Amino acid sequence: MNAIDRPVRFGSVEIESPLILAPMAGVCDLPYRMIARKHGAALVCAEMVSAKGLVYGNKHTREMLTVHKNEHPLSMQLFGAEPEIMARAAKVAQEYGADIIDINMGCPVRKVVQNGEGSALMKNLPLAEKVVSAVVKAVSVPVTVKMRTGWDDSEFVAPELARRCEAAGAAALAVHGRTREQFYSGRADLEKIAAVVKAVSIPVIGNGDITDGPSCARMFEETGCTAVMIGRGAQGNPWIFEEVRDYLSGRTVQKPSAADRYAVLLEHFEGLIRFKGAHIALREMRSHASWYTKGLFGSAALRERINRTSTVEEFRQVISGVAKCTV
């Protein structure tokens, strides 16, 4: 059996393969999660949500927890730094249908870390452990943690944080091989992910710079991780899960055609209309469209046309018109 043709278990939840869609703000909306599942993601993660927003009934935050019956298993990621609030939010997320609760200890964005949340928790390991413990005690579903290798290069805290998370009851850990200070610059450090794998007995999910079959193979081979989590490599590219699966299984890798890309772009757009309404769908689809069309002939001019559309029908006509020219 190769690295891909096997189920993976996180606590009580088993997924059919070790391929996971990372939680990404502005990317992992419900329609895209459904598309990723269809193209081979064994576990999808919703966009991170504020624990305080959930607990205090923020309408927009709760709307982000809308779940479709066909996307399970689903992980919902929470960010926050107050154990009691995180525990209460986890209960809400479970009630909304989360199969796994993920705790964000990796977000590098300033407005998150300035509140001591996200990757700032890596600078306060006792508090991080308390957050995990509180969430584990509050819910009956598995709890996972997503982290980075540390705040900066001055201290490699991930192994110790991983041990503390395991002691607090975490079922698995996802490790992005960069520090907070790196954001997304440089390369993911696979040696540091491997060190976390050796530090704990629970599954470790490798994350960072997986963009195709060979890079996924390197992640498995050089880290010994149990599963992989694909983030930016999946932006506008749900086919990456099929590509990775085929590559690691020794099958011929089939790249999506331009027609395939336009068809899924429209599928995503129609899903956003149903999920969020026409106005929001038009606005949000501009970012998605730039990812779907990246590298295609005439994509820069197409993006300009897309950005000028003001109605659903205009958007459909622009994409449909370009798609016809690819046939």
At which residue positions do the language-model features occur?
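Alpha/beta catalytic cores of nucleotide-metabolism and tRNA/nucleoside-modifying enzymes
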Residues: 1-11, 15, 19, 25, ...
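Glycine-rich, positively charged N-terminal anion/phosphate-binding segment
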Residues: 2-9, 24-99
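Active-site beta-loop-alpha junctions enriched in small/polar residues
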Residues: 24, 49-51, 79-81, 106-108, ...
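N-terminal small/glycine-rich loop or linker at the start of catalytic domains
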Residues: 8-20, 54-74, 107, 111-115, ...
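Alpha/beta enzyme core
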Residues: 38, 87-117, 125-202, 218, ...
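Hydrophobic faces of well-ordered beta-strands that scaffold small-molecule active sites
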Residues: 19-23, 44-46, 74-78, 101, ...
